Swiss-Prot record:
NCBIfam families noted in UniProt: PRK13667.1
Record InterPro entries: RpoY
Keywords from the named record: DNA-directed RNA polymerase, Nucleotidyltransferase, Transcription, Transferase
Gene that produces this protein: rpoY
Gene Ontology CC terms, in alphabetical order: DNA-directed RNA polymerase complex
Similarity field: Belongs to the RNA polymerase subunit epsilon family.
The name this protein goes by in its record: DNA-directed RNA polymerase subunit epsilon
Described function: A non-essential component of RNA polymerase (RNAP).
Cleavable signal peptide: none
A Gene Ontology BP annotation from the UniProt entry: DNA-templated transcription
Enzyme superclass (EC): transferase
Subunit and interaction comment: RNAP is composed of a core of 2 alpha, a beta and a beta' subunit. The core is associated with a delta subunit, and at least one of epsilon or omega. When a sigma factor is associated with the core the holoenzyme is formed, which can initiate transcription.
Natural source organism: Streptococcus pneumoniae (strain CGSP14)
Length: 77
């Protein structure tokens, strides 16, 4: 399953929509909830300075759209 993690690069400032970034993780999980938990743990362990806003499971259609826009790249820690 592919998850899109929305985050701010620092926890020091208030979140702003304009500075929200995203990364993509390929998570092997048995449920959506387990995948979200694993994604959060991975980001928190490897990038503790990130302020995670939201974690979204990408549907096939949304994944295809993300690939078409050119912004899609799996992050590996």
């Amino acid at each position: 399953m592919i998850y899109k993690v929305f985050y701010q690069e620092t926890k020091e400032r208030s979140p702003r929509r304009e500075t929200t970034r995203a990364l993509y993780l390929d998570i092997d999980a048995s449920s959506e909830l387990e995948g979200r938990i694993t994604a959060r743990q991975l980001v928190e362990e490897n990038r503790p300075e990130y302020n995670i806003e939201y974690i979204e499971l990408l549907s096939d259609k949304l994944l295809d759209y993300e690939k078409e826009t050119g912004a899609f790249e799996i992050t590996e820690f």
